[in-house]
């Protein structure tokens, strides 16, 4: 996804920002493929085809091997009937499906599983860190498929399918940004793969194309909008979809654009649709565009458009397993999206696995490449080929604790995690209060200043400033781990009829983190390449390497949330405020997993507009907080007892050179926004 306010020449849009939207036992590392020798491959494939079956003579296989020719793979295009007429031309829409599959297995008549990425980006904007687009030969068959999935998995006996969402590239129809058209575009392809929908050899012809070569077992994968479509398709409960791997994906489109009425971006889904529409769609889809404007009001009120695009409510329908990946500092598809989806899947007993990085909106191929390819390979082998390789018995969560340093968690959140109510209290100076378990009293007052952001507030946490109210623990005597989603309830009295609120949790103390606010959102792209699969002249499996981009910081914003105070009575509808009247509202903070170390302090900051992350209200309110009716519900591993132990006695400050836990912000840590 691209935030609508980003300049299209921004280098972020050239790569990591799409759409302009127990560890395994030690074993020998398999070699990366840097060359491909077709004759040798053919011999190996023939031998294996003759002697190996899914249950080999010496035991069931644990890993698919690269024994099929990628160079000689079948490459074909099919158009699948979605049974919708989104563009209103009187004909049902067909979506383009580009297929790459092993020729040897086709000759043997063996049915194979499918890995599928359904995307709106294949022609407009490209995929991956190098913004790769599909290319075609003179017959219209795909030559280059973006990313490494086909290069790596086709030689291992999978088919790879790249689907152009309706209204994009070579597909009919209109882009409706996560609605029925988007989801049906991909669902129809799974139906076709399972013999329940019609496919054709051309966009307008009548010659049928049947997917007789597949067993219908499908895994969907994708980052951002692509992963969002995977979430949406899984929420239909479609048969044949066995697993999804959503990366930095949306679970409810309302939560991409709004936070309890507060606008996160300065435009709506119509902008995104227009950006990815094909030229044909632009001439036919005015009605769809108008609906995206009219039914997504800038007031932030919930409408039926958002209900249609809320996949969380349908988590009970999910049949597929879910391997979820998200950056905890993703300020594009914000972390609330993965938190609420994960919780809903857990409540419905869905098999699931999660990776949480310190990055922003970045693919794991670009922040943990070797481990990612290995884990994804084993995941698909287990879920689609049925191999008992132990991936389902590994810890549920991998969490990046420091740049390139990962820990695991058997469950996520860990067993013994409880929501603990932390309460603010007044301190020795205005706006600089305490944070603990006891109910506070008194008030704190601040005035919204849209020129300032969460980093400005954190940098001045120990100063009395007009723009925020800060509440801080003493230096901790032991580590405190937050794992999951927090909620902050505030009771505030505004001076105007409109007001926006922000609440952030901050780890105060020096650290080295991935620089998620840098242009690469935590990675730097290098010039050298490594290869992950087989290549052809038109489709290289070799991709630019990356390294972690780090920053030495004096505070880390670890979770954040926002709301329009006018939505105090309903998360779905705002009303004008009465100046001088107190209102209570709860802000949903993003899911995270973060350890506040011994010697650091934990802070809660409540303020108005968070520059670059929400839009300001129409007025400039001053708000007075009633501290007795303000609190934070924070998921702590070990619960209240862990917090009590960590705060029972003063810890030693982590760095004697730090002024009250924060250095002077002469190099302010930037927040991704319009000017970057």
Swiss-Prot record:
It catalyses: Hydrolyzes Xaa-Pro-|- bonds to release unblocked, N-terminal dipeptides from substrates including Ala-Pro-|-p-nitroanilide and (sequentially) Tyr-Pro-|-Phe-Pro-|-Gly-Pro-|-Ile. This is Putative Xaa-Pro dipeptidyl-peptidase. Belongs to the peptidase S15 family. It is an enzyme of class 3 (hydrolase). Gene3D superfamilies: alpha/beta hydrolase, Galactose-binding domain-like. Residues 423-450 are annotated as: Disordered. It holds the Pfam family PepX_C. One of its GO terms (biological process) is proteolysis. The keyword Hydrolase applies.
């Amino acid at each position: 996804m691209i935030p609508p306010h980003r300049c299209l020449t921004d280098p972020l849009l050239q790569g990591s920002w799409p759409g302009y939207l127990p560890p395994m036992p030690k074993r020998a590392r398999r070699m990366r493929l840097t060359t491909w020798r077709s004759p040798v491959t053919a011999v190996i494939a023939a031998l294996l085809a003759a002697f190996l079956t899914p249950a080999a003579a010496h035991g069931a296989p644990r890993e698919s091997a690269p024994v099929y020719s990628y160079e000689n793979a079948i490459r074909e295009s099919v158009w699948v009937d979605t049974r919708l007429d989104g563009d209103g031309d009187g004909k049902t829409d067909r979506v383009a499906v580009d297929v790459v599959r092993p020729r040897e297995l086709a000759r043997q008549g063996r049915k194979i599983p499918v890995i599928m990425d359904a995307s709106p980006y294949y022609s407009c904007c490209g995929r991956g860190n190098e913004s790769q687009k599909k290319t075609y030969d003179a017959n219209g068959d795909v030559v280059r498929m973006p990313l490494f999935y086909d290069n790596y998995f086709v030689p291992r006996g999978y088919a790879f399918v790249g689907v152009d969402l309706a209204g994009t590239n070579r597909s009919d129809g209109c882009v409706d940004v996560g609605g029925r058209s988007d989801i049906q575009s991909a669902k129809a392809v799974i139906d076709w793969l399972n013999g329940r929908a019609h496919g054709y050899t051309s966009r307008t012809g009548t010659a049928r194309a049947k997917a007789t070569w597949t067993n219908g077992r499908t895994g969907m994968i994708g980052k951002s909008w692509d992963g969002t479509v995977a979430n949406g398709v899984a929420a239909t409960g479609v048969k044949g979809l066995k697993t999804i791997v959503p990366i930095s994906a949306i679970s409810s489109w309302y939560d991409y654009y709004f936070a309890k009425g507060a606008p996160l971006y300065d435009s709506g889904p119509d902008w995104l649709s227009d950006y990815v529409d094909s030229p044909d769609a632009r001439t036919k889809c005015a009605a769809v565009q108008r609906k995206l404007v009219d039914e997504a009001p800038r007031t932030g009120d919930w409408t039926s458009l958002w209900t249609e695009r809320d996949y969380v409510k349908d988590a009970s329908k999910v049949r597929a397993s879910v391997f979820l990946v998200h950056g905890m500092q993703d300020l594009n598809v914000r972390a609330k999206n993965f938190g609420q989806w994960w919780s809903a899947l857990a409540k419905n007993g869905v098999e699931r696995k999660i990776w949480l990085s310190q990055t922003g909106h970045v693919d794991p191929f670009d922040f943990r490449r070797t481990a990612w390819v290995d884990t994804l390979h084993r995941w698909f082998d287990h879920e689609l080929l049925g191999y008992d390789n132990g991936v389902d018995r590994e810890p549920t969560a991998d969490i990046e604790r420091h740049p390139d340093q990962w820990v695991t968690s058997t469950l996520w959140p860990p067993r013994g995690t409880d929501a603990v109510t932390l309460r603010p209290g007044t301190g020795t100076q205005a706006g600089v209060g305490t944070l603990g378990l006891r109910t506070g009293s008194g008030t704190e007052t601040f005035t919204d200043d849209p020129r300032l952001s969460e980093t400005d507030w954190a940098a001045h946490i120990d100063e009395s400033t007009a723009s925020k109210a800060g509440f801080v623990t003493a230096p901790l005597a032991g580590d405190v781990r937050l794992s999951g989603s927090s909620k902050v309830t505030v009771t505030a009295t505004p001076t105007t009829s409109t007001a926006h609120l922000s609440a952030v949790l901050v780890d105060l103390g020096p650290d080295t983190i991935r620089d998620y606010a840098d242009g690469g959102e935590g990675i730097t792209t290098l010039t050298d390449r490594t290869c992950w699969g087989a290549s052809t002249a038109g489709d290289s499996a070799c991709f630019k390497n990356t390294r972690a981009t780090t920053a030495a910081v004096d505070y880390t914003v670890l979770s954040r949330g926002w709301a329009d105070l006018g939505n105090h009575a309903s998360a779905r509808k705002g009303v004008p405020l009465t100046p001088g009247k107190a209102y209570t509202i709860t802000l949903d903070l993003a899911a995270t997993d973060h350890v506040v170390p011994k010697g650091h302090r934990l802070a809660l900051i409540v303020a108005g507009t968070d520059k670059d992350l929400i839009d300001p209200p129409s007025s400039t309110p001053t708000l007075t907080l009633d501290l007795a009716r303000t609190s934070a519900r924070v998921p702590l591993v070990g619960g209240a007892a862990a917090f009590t132990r960590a705060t029972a006695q003063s810890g030693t400050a982590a760095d004697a050179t730090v002024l009250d836990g924060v250095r002077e912000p002469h190099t302010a840590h930037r927040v991704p926004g319009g000017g970057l």
